[in-house]
Amino acid sequence: MKTGLILEGGAMRGMFTAGVLDVLMEQGITVDGMVGVSAGAVFGCNYKSHQIGRTIRYNTTYCNDKRYASFRNLLRTGNLYSEDFCYHEVPEKLDPFDDKAFRESPMDYFVVCTDVRTGDPIYHKCRTGDAEDVRWMEASASMPLAAKIVKIGHYGLLDGGVADSIPIRFFESIGYKRNLIILTQPKGFVKKKNPMLPVIRARYLRYPAFVEAVADRHERYNETLSYISMLEQSGKDYVIRPPIPLEIGAMERDPDQLRRVYETGRAVAQIQVDKIRAFLETANAEAEE
């Protein structure tokens, strides 16, 4: 039995996740494996590479840089978040991603993408943190309408949150029976049908299975939340979530807003750190029995 960490996406609500992860790293809290979705995928990699503060640092540094994210990028390239700047210039030069530490960490790391042809989730294990792995992370965070379809091998991929927003059942199926789950919505949140569905239906006319996955995403999401609530109440899994709605834009240009959400994550984690540690110690003890 293995311990896992599951990271929901949510665009810049992911700063909450970044705050939680930095506290976990500072406290030396680790798990056997983790899986990230969308923002959870591109921010969570820094937990495996143990780069405390990197996520909030590069986001606050470049949030006002049009090379990073802008509607100009979207009109010129089809990507709101620049592929070249976000996934090459920043991690390779400006704020280097430590792929060596990522590769040497014993923690398994998975990302979730959505296959646009089938509407199904694709779960990819990132082993080295190399350019191909970063490409999978990019695909996981490529939001419909805001990013081009990412081609990897024979796949056409978009945001993993469409097919599997919180991949608890996937992680259970591969042996992660006791999990920390970081959500980016408060308790009681209920997802509604995507109001952009007519636009998505028109934009992805060639991919009807993907459109249907978008159409019923809210139903699958809410059912997964109910399942997670049951796991939480039974003590099998431990859920970390913001106390109130985070209220931050998908493309946030105010570094103070990014820091506010990040500090909310830190505060929640600091309050709960002893409970988190106790949960994992109990899970590890059970695994040894």
Regions found by a protein language model. Give the residues of each.
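Patatin-like phospholipase
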Residues: 1-37, 45-289
